[in-house]
Amino acid sequence: MGNTVIIAVCTVAIEVVFGCMAAYAFARNRSRLNSFMQSFCLGIMMIPPLSILVGVYTELVALGGINQQWAVIVIAAAFGLPMSIHLYTNFINSIPVALDEAAAIDGAGVLRTFWSIVLPQLKPVTVSVIILKGV
């Protein structure tokens, strides 16, 4: 029970932190590279995990990650991160850009805008990600 809780909490924390930051970059920056990266994330979601299991196992053996908690956490987070990014990106797209512009006019940088304006509004989707990934 203890190992499962540690793995679940660490995996969900990684997915929430990196997912919301990556999604903010995807949602607010419009470029060809961002649309390619979004398509790449969606493409990763379509690959069945069992199809790359042999390659992942080979790399874990080379890295000494067999029977290690960190290996399970990294693999679980890597497989779950595209879905978290997708959920966060769609939610951030519904937040008006005018809020970011108003924060910029008030002198807030990108990190301050994300931390003070966008992140508090991400509570509903964060709860959804925690429920979907933590169960």
Residue map of PLM features:
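A structural signal for multi-pass alpha-helical bundles of membrane permease subunits
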Residues: 1-135
